[in-house]
Every structure is written in C-alpha cells, then in structure tokens.
C-alpha cells in the first residue's frame, strides 16, 4: 500500500457505480459529524466522485481534519451539533449524512453518549425533515448470535448489550419516529465494522501478533468491511431512503475467525501468535445479503486486506492508536 497518502487515495477512490450515483444527485450534500474516523474520507470520496458541493460539519476540535477537508475542496463549518441554535443555522440541503456518534470513552460518560447517539440524530432528522438522510448507526443493536451463523438480518429482533448499544438503538427508534412523523426518507445503516490499515479488528490482531502480545479469543468471530467499500456503498444509498425509515446492514460477506486471522498473520509475519482463552459460542455478527442484493459485492476482500495489513505493520505504518475493543462482551467501551 505504501504510505498514508497512498492509503488515503485508496480509501477515497470512488467506484464507477459511485460516480454514476453521485451524478444523479441534484444538490448540496451535508455531512454531519465529519471529523471522525470515516467522515473526512467520505467527504473526499464524494468530491472525487463529482459532487458539486459538499459541506462538512464538526466541532473540529482537531484542526488537522478541518485543514484536510479544506484542502480537498470541501466547505467546512465548525459547529456543536448538540447546540440547537447551531443546528438550525446550518444551510438547507437536499442530502444529509448523519455520522456523529460516541463509542470509545462512553463508559463513565453515559449522559454524553445518549445525547450524541440518541438525541442528536433525532434533532438532525427533525431539522432536515425535507431532505433524504443516510443515518449511520451500529450493528451493536443486535444480540450475540451463533458464531456458526451468517449473522443477524435487518428484520431480526434487536437486543443491545450495554449502554453504548442501547443508546444506538434509542437513536434508531427516535430517527424512525421523526421519519414517520414528517415523511422524511431515511435509511438507517447498521455498520459492523469498517477497517483500514491504521484501525480495525484486523489491524489489532495483526499488530498484536507482530508485537508478541496476547490475543483474546473470547469474541471468536467478527465481520469486517474495507472502509473504502463502506464509503462507496454509503455514497450510493440516497435512492434507498424511505419513510418509514429503511434499515440496511453494512458489513463484509465473510464471518472471520479471530483465531484464523492470527494464525494467517503469524505465517506471513514469521511469528507464532500468542492466543489466550477459548472462543465463545456466540458473537456480534451481521448478515449482508440484502446489501449485496441491492448494491453488489465488495471490491476488497479479507485476504487482500490481510496482505496489505501485514506489510503495513512490518514497515512501521502509523496506527490511529484506537483499539477496537473487539474482544469485549460486556458492551462497555
């Protein structure tokens, strides 16, 4: 993959299908919560796909993200989305992404977690009731299912574990309420989980193998999707918005074994993984058959990601320093 510039280019590269979808959008796109892990890359991908105007909104407590977005051609607005006056002052647009969310550090900050994950999305949908809205939620709203299964489907019952997951389900319920009340077309996207070379479960496992650290097998299976694929899918979702709100799982097609990831990484790195514990019979997994049926297959699969990741780690590539906590079964992050 090379350096971070090459990584960013790959993550923000629009597919032909994305270019076609963006060409059909007849107005400005607003990205709320554009300063997180996915926001800056989504904004750049939309611009590269030909979007005439993309406005990125965040508190931008880290000026690096705002500078980056200004450089790639976005219009940036610094705003606290929990401030009603600030939210109402944002421009009227026909297309909105809601990416704002609070996961890591949520334990001990429960009030902020619920405000960000539940109250804020509902207020955003109310504010943009005349727009089409892609709302990014989480697969954590589902219960654990058998590791041998294909994962939870969109129509399956939810049963969130822990306050983070509960707050995400709360956000979904209030967004659905606002969508139904105002006839606002929305798609709620349940992500399990975006991965790139500086962050993600594959990154965590490969890094631990390389450094000789223990790898906990208690959460023995997981889904991952290359972040570039996730962003391309999201850029094509506005036609899928509906009222009542539609729901779509966003993840890769493979159920990955943490043990197998570690063992394959060990072979490629020439190191023996240090595995501890045993796989539980259940894991947090999502079924993406509906996604593939509507929007097609991912472009990047696990084997390709693993090869890139091993090279990245061996060459000392930078990490975001944000462990996923994939092994946690308590729902506390």
Where do the language-model regions lie?
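NAD(P)H-binding glycine-rich loop region in Rossmannoid oxidoreductase-like domains
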Residues: 40, 63, 68, 74-116
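NAD(P)-dependent short-chain dehydrogenase/reductase
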Residues: 149, 169, 173-229, 265
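N-terminal Rossmann NAD(P)H-binding glycine-rich loop of SDR-like oxidoreductase domains
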Residues: 31-47
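Conserved glycine-rich Rossmann-like NAD(P)H-binding loop of the short-chain dehydrogenase/reductase
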Residues: 51-64
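Short-chain dehydrogenase/reductase
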Residues: 114, 118, 150-156, 160-172, ...
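Amphipathic terminal alpha-helices
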Residues: 2-22, 28, 302-333
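Mid/C-terminal beta-alpha module of Rossmann-like enzyme folds, strongest
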Residues: 213, 220, 233-290, 330-331
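Conserved Rossmann-fold NAD(P)-dependent oxidoreductase catalytic core, especially the SDR/UDP-sugar
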Residues: 28, 95-98, 103, 119-163
